[in-house]
Design a protein with these regions (language model features):
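Long, non-catalytic terminal segments
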Residues: 1-37
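Conserved active-site and cofactor/substrate-binding residues in soluble primary-metabolism enzymes
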Residues: 2, 6, 42, 55, ...
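Short HxH-centered metal-ligating active-site micro-motif
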Residues: 4, 59-98
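Divalent metal-coordination and catalytic microenvironments
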Residues: 11, 47, 71
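Fold-independent oxyanion-binding glycine-rich loops
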Residues: 14-15, 21, 50-51, 73-74
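Short, electropositive, low-hydrophobicity segments enriched in small/polar residues
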Residues: 18, 53, 79
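N-terminal short beta-loop-beta anion/metal-coordinating cradle
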Residues: 26-66
């Protein structure tokens, strides 16, 4: 297990690669798409899923950044806060699918 400090550094390095356009993965976000994220988001689906780090919704559904509004919860128990997040996305973004 790595330390919290090492984990934070790893996240910062990954974010820096993303910002500079240098990626270590095959899935690439085009520059024009990244610029569109500044304007807001228009997710086409709301995913309420497991918080298991091995199951990232964007990867398992082969979708890009901004395509999904993902709410992750541990223990398969949906609390009012998660329901509120689903309601927020549906109302704010007009997302048609939960």
């Amino acid at each position: 297990m790595i330390t919290a400090s090492d984990a934070l550094e790893r996240l910062k390095e990954g974010n820096q690669r993303f910002l500079s356009g240098v990626r270590s993965i095959d899935t690439i976000v085009k520059q024009i798409q990244r610029e569109n994220f500044v304007e807001g988001q228009e997710p086409f689906a709301i995913i309420l899923g497991c918080s298991d780090s091995r199951v990232p919704a964007e990867i398992i559904f082969d979708q890009g950044l901004g395509d999904l509004f993902v709410i992750r919860v541990a223990g398969n128990i949906v609390a009012p806060s998660q329901v509120g997040s689903v309601e927020f996305a549906a109302e704010r973004f007009g997302t048609p699918l939960v």
